[in-house]
């Protein structure tokens, strides 16, 4: 039988080659066991694999028999998703607002992952190129890269904000959108079951009437399918709005160039002081010319980028155009998508002022810097997009929230020790700071003011030294001296099987990403065929990897981290030796592991 992943790859190619194709009978691929082994491979390494939903179902205990039971329930259409367990997480550092997460059971995660793979094969090739959220080989950085390239020269920004986007997705609208592309009642009914599964909060069941639970495996692609309608609307609006530029010079520019040509003509016959005066006049006129707009702004253009529910438009036009576009957006979102565009947060900002997108401040530069080219000069930065770090709004709240710094009465900032991590080892303390520093610096590695993070590095480094000093009742200077490596940096030594290694304190310049602007294209089939069948092979072998018993049904024992195993039990030694988070064992061994 042909591997299902190859069939999905063929579906992907058909969708890419014929964007109007309607797909049918996709539900049957949910009944193929090989996709569930691939789904388990995709999920088991995640931190959430061991997180419980509303019951004790986790990645531990996965088996061929479990896959067979899931497939049978899907085949006879008795499969019913469990309600998700609702949990709240903080939205932002130092914010009192919280975001609800819905945590499914692991069995539901498996089915959702298989469903996600099927939907992705159909929709990924037809999603807008302006959409970057929750998509393979795309990220915040690819969205910002596209913005930097496409928004050059725009006059206005429209920052889009949909009120409670994920919580207000209309289930009927979503079902209608999917039904337009996929004519498969069983598949749409399964999606409907997940949408209507409800949630448990404080052991009370609550029905869901709208929205996709944040935390669900299939929720991101369902949100993208829904918001792809917004992408298509904006792109259609942009085509109608577009007006090509009448390429003619401004009267002011023509006047200056005419004066220069007249002076150059007079220069041919001039002598002495007259010639010197003309040369000075020409130089002054050229300086004026380089500061004068050369082309009339008669073009009309809309540029658009979306990352999940966060989107921004760049408009070449006037403010009245932006107001009209905003009204059109609001009408479409309310009438077609049944959601609401926030009037207060959907801002219209002139491009010489900063707008906010994906945690960056963006603006269009109006610098008149000149660059020599042979016998003439040209303007280089005018109209280019600048991405900046909002240091006061993003970095400082992060530092205060992590108790890295404090503000003195005179307003100055100083790094402080983080007493709540004194109990950690020196290696763990340095690793914590390194992880936080690299996370911030990697995200802002494409900012034009990236060097501002040198101050961030300084505050993090001296907070780390003060934390180590506080733990050992010493001083920062002594800790620096103790851990100095002789190469101008410092780090904590630690023992490994290969000998002593050193965890050096991270540097912000090491995070400057030089390869960011290259997109990697990965073939879908090549990325999944091969090692992805290892779980299938191990379970089908019917040989217990612990006791060696043969021809027995097996289950997967799962742990979150191999490094946390102590090596005191036989099964721990086996997992450490294999360097795996999973072990295929018989039911007797699995019972002994959990009940020694």
Predicted stretch roles:
Residues 1-596:
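Non-catalytic terminal/accessory segments
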